[in-house]
Amino acid sequence: CCMALCSRYHCLPCC
């Protein structure tokens, strides 16, 4: 993937 939006609980792929 290009990028990832990450928090303490989860990482959501952002493509």
Curated annotation (Swiss-Prot):
Keyword annotations for this protein, in alphabetical order, are:
Amidation, Disulfide bond, Secreted, Toxin
Compartments (UniProt record): Secreted
Q: In which tissues is it expressed?
A: Expressed by the venom duct.
**Record-listed Cysteine amide modification sites:** C15
Disulfide linkages recorded for this protein, renumbered to the chain, are C1-C15, C2-C11, C6-C14
| Record flagged with keyword tRNA processing | no
GO CC terms in record: extracellular region
GO function terms (MF aspect): toxin activity
Record text about domains: The cysteine framework is III (CC-C-C-CC).
Family the entry assigns: Belongs to the conotoxin M superfamily.
What is the name of the protein in this document?
A: Conotoxin reg3g
Q: Which organism is it from?
A: Conus regius (Crown cone)
